[in-house]
UniProtKB/Swiss-Prot annotation:
Annotated motif Q motif, positions: 7-35
Reaction catalysed by this enzyme: ATP + H2O = ADP + phosphate + H(+)
Biased composition (Basic residues): 506-525, 532-547
Recorded GO MF terms: ATP binding; ATP hydrolysis activity; protein sequestering activity; RNA binding; RNA helicase activity; RNA stem-loop binding
Chief site of localization: nucleus
Organism of provenance: Homo sapiens (Human)
Protein name, entry field: Probable ATP-dependent RNA helicase DDX56
Summary of subunit composition and partner proteins: May form homooligomeric complexes. Interacts with IRF3. Interacts with OCT4 and POU5F1.
Amino acid sequence: MEDSEALGFEHMGLDPRLLQAVTDLGWSRPTLIQEKAIPLALEGKDLLARARTGSGKTAAYAIPMLQLLLHRKATGPVVEQAVRGLVLVPTKELARQAQSMIQQLATYCARDVRVANVSAAEDSVSQRAVLMEKPDVVVGTPSRILSHLQQDSLKLRDSLELLVVDEADLLFSFGFEEELKSLLCHLPRIYQAFLMSATFNEDVQALKELILHNPVTLKLQESQLPGPDQLQQFQVVCETEEDKFLLLYALLKLSLIRGKSLLFVNTLERSYRLRLFLEQFSIPTCVLNGELPLRSRCHIISQFNQGFYDCVIATDAEVLGAPVKGKRRGRGPKGDKASDPEAGVARGIDFHHVSAVLNFDLPPTPEAYIHRAGRTARANNPGIVLTFVLPTEQFHLGKIEELLSGENRGPILLPYQFRMEEIEGFRYRCRDAMRSVTKQAIREARLKEIKEELLHSEKLKTYFEDNPRDLQLLRHDLPLHPAVVKPHLGHVPDYLVPPALRGLVRPHKKRKKLSSSCRKAKRAKSQNPLRSFKHKGKKFRPTAKPS
């Protein structure tokens, strides 16, 4: 189509420095949301845009924001430096991600446009120093932005020109309603605003009335998830809870799931139970949760994206169950403490090249399923979603399928063709491993990991800043070992491999390494001449007695 050809990045009137940054990122063409939103934003219109997760919403507001700021500095009257752009996001991780994207797009104009993120867990004094320099764009959560506004370390009433609310449908459910209303009192009467959301609900409608002025609504006609040619979605019915653990063990140990995978569970306790269970079989994983320091969570995501880990267990108590309005959640499902209410996993976080999403626990809402599934099959890459379902959860599964199917009444979640009787030989192993993962073991594992991550996060912060290469050596998937680990469980004998898979799969076996104590002993022995010296003397042969 001619119209679509006329709306490439090079035809949007963008600054050459932005075009160069877009080229460096490897974006040959804008996504649908970018193609529609950027020209309208450059015309000065308020936008209410809905697009599915992974569709490029961040760049859809970041590019016009940078273009408008650069154009103003190049053609407008000379005015003092001030904060002119504000980006509000529901979680610290999303704030860091938004800042990173804006900085990448501003690579060639970094002197003209500066970006600051004030949501990180730093002391307010250091953040105040950053804000005193008056960056052009400030990114943060509503609570942290409001705190700086109340302390007068951030002033927006006379300077703000652009306001962005990203993942708008989550802000109220994360408990930011009061902060948002208070924050708006510190803004000028006139400004351009963008509201970006994956879904349109009552919360988004309320935000629209609070923030937008005669907006253009972009409700793109696209499915909430990629089509079956890109994203394959399966369900597998497990008769018991034990069957779920058994099936997961077989999928991972026999390498039936290839590439990087995300395992979603509904509670923090379940995530550690699953990690300790897999640890019994020498399957390394790491848990991403809100109890860990922000630096540790971001480091885990970064290393996962770089290929350090093949499997991450994720939990996001903030988006499970009914939204809590007007207050922060103190506890998630089954009493899990949400120690960091601004930590989020299932929505918006950019995991790179995820081959498979495994819903070990059925998502509590159809929307949660969409957000989880959106972690794979991004940027035209293929992906698989496999959902484990108990017989008692069939009704809830039907609700998810109803939302996914829409007008197309065909089945979306196809049955996963797997014969459980083929892996019955592994059941006794799984049962043995499940028994050893007690509540006490889970408590000890959580405490141990939090202590270690706090140490890594705080004590080594300055060291890693001076020695960035050593940061790559810091692992988050090392065994916790509060449960009794039986070494033989890490090995899969050939007779246990299902007949249909023999010769096709090779259960990955970890190369045996000498323990540090063995290596030290061997080195000490080789360096000690008294212990390493060997003398081969002539053997004594008795002479024959004369007769």
